[in-house]
């Protein structure tokens, strides 16, 4: 839409980009709604060819468009693999029972990684899970070269939508926070650089544990937010405290 092309958008989820933090979700929806008409939470969408155009209807949103871009999730296709013959057990929904740390299906020598888990369908997560699963599998078959090596654990969750501004969530999501967690908010309206960039709608939310004073997670809508999210993920994985973070170099 910023290139002069009229764009309309819809999604089945009522929350844009599945943002868990309500303040960040509200800021993102308000901002991007000014960029293009949107209809969220629409389960039924009509896309019907009419001559050289496509009639598009989603809730109250109706438009005749030239092109339709569809993005959809990935569902693991495990039903035809007969994993039960390898000792894999399943839950009531037909999903394998597996250990999140080792990626091993319970009571079996089958390991899941990447999209097969259906849990973190992100490229960097899939790459890391492939390494973990391979190392655990070699241990399981008794490969002596892997027995004494440190076990690689899962990294802190890091999810980024590469938009302008970026949307990112790091560590614990807002819905996963313990009741005692402290939540602090920084907004673009209070930052000189954001004012110059004319970005008052930018927002950063940080979550911390008051007892350990460690950072638990973050959610943000910021220009260049991917870099800030990456640094915050490092800080959370290192179990940095608020004081340690404040002592680090920073700029405006």
Model features per residue range: what roles?
Residues 1-51, 55, 121-127, 142-175:
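Rossmann-like dinucleotide-binding cores of NAD(P)H-dependent redox enzymes
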Residues 63, 67-146, 246:
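FAD-site-proximal beta/loop scaffold in flavoenzymes
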